[in-house]
């Protein structure tokens, strides 16, 4: 989009007592990102009078925050039943070690002591499953490193402790991690999963506290962390 507001061509619609209009943006570019066939709006149960003029306004609000060269979701991913969703706010998370907010490496399961093989797969990526499927992914170690280098300070949002990144644009709640024994360790520290594996069944993650934010690889595949997804 080259402007904040764009007007479409005028289309003729035959009047009916009750009809549904579908608006689909087949080609859409915002900034340097393509969103082709991603936006569809249905206006159902509408009545149109003969000779009338009507205007339908579609407002597009971004569901991501661009920091450090990546677009980050506005909330952590969580599992509920067999489905995956984003929290309604950046500070939100599901409490409890198996409440749906902690994931081992390379697995869709939020249960304790679960992980996938040594090659990270989209089929095992909780972010990849969020509708529309294939839009998001777990960040790489470099993407988390870039987020940490974008400017960090500890703080709180909505009463939840955590860290701000990129000039207060991205907030990650500090939730600690879930050990193999189903214990929530270091709840005042932030640990966020990457898709990048390390040696000996370890993996990279972003760790932050009141003093620093660094990329680390101390923990194992089966140690569960929260995930903040990025756009693919």
What are these regions (language model features)?
Residues 3, 8-133, 196-198, 221-232:
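Short, compositionally biased
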Residues 1-3, 172:
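Short helix-loop boundary/capping segments
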